[in-house]
Amino acid sequence: MSAAAKPKVYGWCPGALRPMMSGDGLVVRVRAPLGRLSPEQARGLADLSQAHGSGLVDISARANLQLRGIREDAHAALIDGLRALGLVDEDAGAEARRNITLTPFWRAGDDSHQIAQDLAQALRGAEDLDLPGKFGFAIDCGETPVLQDTAADIRIERGPDGLILRADGADSGLPVTARDAAGEALALARWFLDQGGAPEGRGRMLQLLARRARPTAHVAPAPIAPQGETQHPGQTASGLLVALEFGQMPATTLAALADHGALRLTPWRMLLVEGARNLPPLPGLILDATDPRLRVSACTGAPGCPQARAMTRDLARDLAPSVPMGQHLHLSGCAKGCAHPRPADLVLTATDEDTFDLIRNGTAADHPLNTSLSADALRAAPDLLTEGS
């Protein structure tokens, strides 16, 4: 990656009270309690997006909603609207700490549900806990794990003998109960800070474990379970799972979905519509599990992101049918690779206005196999993606 291509790394994620400026206005991230929106909240968010922003809504890789294109002079009014909907914390510190990803398949009263409620309350009150902006918790206590590929620093899962608290990347952990899991998770977060895990306010658990021993009490075997079956649009026991094209939908689609049930947010850029069995076609929705767009990830790109060096989504849409079944294409506007931080089979990283590097089996920042591929050339000969592989 050339020095000119190096993107700016902020080290924190936007929130509602601490938004981030992008190329299309403010990005305001909404962390819905329990990762769930009631129909009233979903309609309210759609109205706020249209009134104060671009009318585009993203779902992030940590199961949060992002309102895009919010005008700076409308931010205060937006926050008032979010407060009325019960979708904003008391202060930016509490909002930043409450970085929880919850399995969308929780049931009312089950372990995941109880722990998520307790942990959210504990984090709001832990004013001394100055965690890095990207530090997060995953609660995945169902019989089959579904969040193993979701970024998190502290994980609460179901092990062979019950619930277990595990530092990300560790193959051992601390047995817990649903009652004490939240408190032990906070203790592990404090251990992370005490061990110097956040120099200059940044750092992740995986990096700390690579250079230090784990907590002395975390000795119970906790082999890292393989990720459960890849999630696709379709029927589940809890409702209908629907995907969003590149993780984005117009606010009108969000409002229309609310007519069919409460919405659960997922880290797969999908929504779970509680109790639904059928949905009409709506702009931005993918209902077919074989849709080739599911084999492609693409960030906002230019001009929506000031760090993107090229437009991304039109090209991603055009190339999707050429991505082989079972493979994934990540099209990134810069080397940060926000849309798909993990390695992908095929990666196109923008290096100039109409120029991309091709990387195979890597991330957007890895060394390219081919350079200076134009968007027109890729459209004309999409087999360039897999040629010689």
What kind of region is each of these model predictions?
Residues M1-G11, V219, D383-S389:
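Short, low-complexity, intrinsically disordered N-terminal peptides in bacterial proteins
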Residues S2-K6, S22-I164, D171, P175-R179, ...:
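Small-residue-enriched alpha-helical segments and adjacent helix-cap loops
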Residues S2-P19, Q227-Q231:
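Intrinsically disordered, low-complexity polar/charged tails and linkers
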Residues A74, G197-E229:
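Terminal amphipathic helices with adjacent charged low-complexity linkers/tails
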Residues E90-A94, W191-R202, A377-S389:
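Flexible helix-coil linker/hinge segments at domain or subdomain boundaries
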Residues G125-E127, R360-N361, D366-S389:
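Short flanking/linker segments adjacent to small metal-binding domains or redox-active Cys/His motifs
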Residues G169-E200:
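Internal alpha/beta scaffold segment
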Residues G169-L174, P303-G304, G362-S372:
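Short beta-alpha connecting loops at secondary-structure transitions
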